[in-house]
Amino acid sequence: MMNNGTETLKEFLNYIQFERGYSAHTVTAYQHDLEKFLNFIYKYDSILLKDFGKIDRQAIRHFLGKEYEEGNSAKTVARRLASIKSLFNYLVQAEVICDNPAIHIKTPKVEKKIPTFVQENKIEELMKMPDAVTLIGKRDRAILELFYATGIRLNELAGLNIGSVNPQEKLLRVLGKGNKERIVPFGKPAKHALESYLKKRGKSWASPQETPLFTSRGDKRIAVRTIQQRVNIYLKAVLGGRTGASPHTLRHTFGTHLLENDADIRSIQELLGHSSISSTQIYTKVNPKKMIEIYRDKHPHGS
C-alpha cells in the first residue's frame, strides 16, 4: 500500500476509535476491510492513492466484483462496501475530496437468518448448569443471568465495573456503542447471582468505578474470548449442540421473550440500546420510567 493510503487509513481509524468511540473489535474490522480495498486499488492503479478524489465508482465496483470472485458471501461484500462508504464520508467531511464515489453503489442483499434463541422453558436448565459452589461457577451463573436479564452485548458485559451495578435499585449502567451510556434494569435472579458471586470473591474494592465486575485468574478483567467460550459451552448443552450459539444468543433470547410477553417493540429497542430503526424513531422514544415498568412486568426474570 502506498504511503498516502497508509496515512489516510491511519487517520480514519484514529477518528472512528477516539472521536466516534468505536470498539477495538469494530476498528479492527474496518482496518481489515480497508487494507484489502487499498491494496486492491494500489494494484489496480497505484496513482489513485496519491489522490483519493480520483478513485471512482468503477474502481470500487471492480473491487467488489473481485471479492465475489474470491468466494466471499454477500454479507462480507456488504460489510466491505459499508467500510468503504464510511472512509469516503470521512474524507468528504475532512474536505480531502468533494464527493463520495461509493454513495450510490447499492448494498448487496443479505438474507436475514432467524436468530437462535433459548426457549423460555429451557432458561432454568441453562442457569443451573454452572457449578453452584466454585467461584468460576458462580461467576458464570452471574454472567448468564445478566446476559439474559439485560440483553447487553458481549463487549458491554466484559467492560462492566463493580460501580456499574446498583443492586438496591436493580439497575445497570452500560456503556454501549459510540460510548453511549444507558440504564438497563434487571431482576431478582440476576441480583442474587451477582451477590453470590461477589460474596464468594470476598474482597473489598477501594475504587469500584474502576474495578472489573467479572474477572479471571489474577483478578484481571475477564477476556471477551473467555466469556464466549464459557457461555458457548452452556448454550450448546441446552440447545442440543446446535451450531450458532453464542453470547449474542442470550441477547436475542432477551428480546424474543419480551416480545412474546407483549412488550412494546420500541421499549425493547431502548432496552437493547439499538440505534433508531427509522428517521421518525426519535419522536417515539418512551419515558425511561415507563420503560422500566414495562420491563418489570413483561420479562420473565424482571421482578
Tell me what each language-model feature is.
Residues 1-303:
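Conserved catalytic core of the tyrosine transesterase superfamily
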